Amino acid sequence: MSHAHIMSAFDEELKYLTRRISEMGGLAEQMVADSVRALVNSDLALAQKVISDDTILDDAERQIGEKAIVTIAKRQPMASDLREIMGSIRIAADLERVGDLGKNTAKRVIAVAGSGIPRKLARGLEHLAELALVQLKEVLDVYASRSPEKANSIRERDEEIDAIYTSLFRELLTYMMEDPRNITPCTHLLFCAKNIERIGDHATNIAETIYYMATGAQPQGERPKDDMTSTLGSVTD
């Protein structure tokens, strides 16, 4: 087999990984958007669709991982090519987790459907989701361009989502203190808000991976963070 043919086959394998990552990203975005829409509108059918779609994302991550391992074994890539493949594995894992967070939000739709969500809280959740989805979309666009400058710019904006999450966290605590009947639905909403905030963290993870893929170095400095909920109590995934 000629060297040119081998390189052509290797290029196709890299293109496969890039294409599948893009497909995963599109589905993850849709799942998050649908999960929040289902939550705000008490749409049980849409919530169930999100839950079902998660298996597609899980399968895609597994297929990307398997393809990456086979490609490394066959081609023994070095330097930027190896970073490209390893980066694909890391990004696929982050996108799979984004899908899990969307699914977890969708699962809570049933729990809060009967009580309804105050419009002010619904707007807060929608705004938080909009910011997280913009960050996710932008980082997927940067994945296509492999721009380290743009990747670093996205990484430095993570604190905006944290600040909105902290504000929403406080509002939910206030609702719970005002009326004990709000405790159960607001607890579910706290978990949903944390799910959405974590999506921003995964977008930042992807930005850091892209930076590494493009430069071979890790981004310098600590991530900017503005999550102040630790002073009020904490909510975990």
UniProtKB/Swiss-Prot annotation:
It is found in: Cytoplasm. GO terms for molecular function: protein homodimerization activity. SUPFAM superfamilies: PhoU-like (SSF109755). Residues 217-237 are annotated as: Disordered. The keyword Magnesium does not apply. InterPro entries: P_transport_PhoU, PhoU-like_sf, PhoU_dom. The keyword Manganese does not apply. Keywords: Cytoplasm, Phosphate transport, Transport. Its main location: cytoplasm. GO terms for biological process: intracellular phosphate ion homeostasis; negative regulation of phosphate metabolic process; negative regulation of phosphate transmembrane transport; phosphate ion transport. It comes from the Bacteria. GO terms for cellular component: cytoplasm. Plays a role in the regulation of phosphate uptake. Belongs to the PhoU family. Homodimer. PANTHER family: PHOSPHATE-SPECIFIC TRANSPORT SYSTEM ACCESSORY PROTEIN PHOU. This is Phosphate-specific transport system accessory protein PhoU homolog. The gene is phoU.
